[in-house]
Every structure is written in structure tokens, then in C-alpha cells.
């Protein structure tokens, strides 16, 4: 599954006006969303040296240098992207605090796109300090969100021979 293709389809189908990209790192989705004309808030706690400074001055992108756990939601969004964010935090923080904040700052019928590595993924087996999530964790949020879609896929680790990343995504819609 190509993430960019999936996110492009979500943007085309739902036409979000305001998007939040949590822990954006390489800004792929931020740039993609801005190219569709959406206003994008980018949240990350590092300066991204891989992209030129002019991206931080893009007219549709606002950059916030914050840690996810310290970010104070102020805006309402149509689409929130959390690619490979949850595995860095305990379930209590993600499922109670962060998902409540997302719910409270996601417009009605807004979409939350979450990805995480599954336990047999190279990233998880080589980083024991990461936290494991599965689909059931997000199904338990049914009082807040409707589970619209989910999928998992495997792809090779480009820097390790005979190793695989096993990743799952969920798409939640605010009721």
C-alpha cells in the first residue's frame, strides 16, 4: 500500500480544508495535503533538516515545534494524520488523552488516519521500548469514532536484507 496514494484518495474524497499532521518528520503528507489547497498544521519536535527552510514558509503550512504530549489543540480539523506516532507512547496516553483531544478537535465526520507497526515488524522487534498496538485498541474507541477502514501490509526493510516491516493503518471517523 502506498501511503501517499491512500492519503491522496482520502483528501480527494473528503476535501478537508484544515489538516493536522502529528509528528510529521519528513513532511510527506503535509506537502501532499497543502498541494490540494488545504491549510495544514505540522507538528513535530525536531527541526527537519531533510527539507529546505522554504517549506516552513509555505503559505498553506504552519509549523509548530512541539512534542505531541505537550501540544495544546486549539483549532478544529477535518483530517488528522498520525503516521507512526502511537507506538512511541503508552496506551493510557494515546487511547485516553490523545484520542480524546483528537475527538474534541476533529469536526463532525472528520477523519483520523493512524498507522503503527505490528509486533512482528522489524521496527518493533529491534526497539523493545516501543509500545505495541493492534486493531482492537482502536475498535474500543467506538463511543467516539466509527472505524471506517483498516488494513495491514508487509514491505521489505530497505536497509536490512530479508527483514520486513509489518504495518497496520486505521481510519476513524468522528461521529
Tell what function each PLM region has.
Residues 1-14, 26-36, 40-59, 65-72, ...:
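Class I (Rossmann-like) S-adenosyl-L-methionine-dependent methyltransferase catalytic domain
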Residues 23:
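Conserved S-adenosyl-L-methionine
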Residues 81:
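A conserved beta-strand element that flanks and buttresses the S-adenosyl-L-methionine
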Amino acid at each position: 500500500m502506498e501511503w501517499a496514494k491512500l492519503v491522496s484518495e482520502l483528501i480527494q474524497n473528503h476535501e478537508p480544508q484544515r489538516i493536522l499532521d502529528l509528528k510529521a518528520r519528513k513532511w510527506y503528507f503535509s506537502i501532499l495535503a497543502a498541494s490540494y489547497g488545504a491549510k495544514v498544521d505540522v507538528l513535530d519536535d525536531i527541526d527537519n533538516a531533510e527539507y529546505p527552510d522554504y517549506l516552513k514558509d509555505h503559505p498553506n503550512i504552519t509549523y509548530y515545534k512541539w512534542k505531541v504530549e505537550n501540544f495544546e489543540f486549539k483549532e478544529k480539523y477535518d483530517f488528522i494524520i498520525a503516521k507512526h506516532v502511537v507506538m512511541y507512547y503508552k496506551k493510557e496516553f494515546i487511547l485516553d488523552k490523545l484520542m480524546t483531544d483528537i475527538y474534541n478537535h476533529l469536526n463532525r465526520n472528520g477523519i483520523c488516519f493512524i498507522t503503527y507497526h505490528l509486533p512482528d515488524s522489524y521496527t518493533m522487534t529491534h526497539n523493545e521500548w516501543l509500545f505495541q498496538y493492534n486493531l482492537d485498541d482502536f475498535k474500543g474507541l467506538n463511543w467516539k469514532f466509527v472505524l471506517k477502514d483498516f488494513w495491514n501490509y508487509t514491505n521489505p526493510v530497505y536497509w536490512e536484507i530479508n527483514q520486513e516491516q509489518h504495518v497496520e493503518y486505521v481510519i476513524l471517523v468522528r461521529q
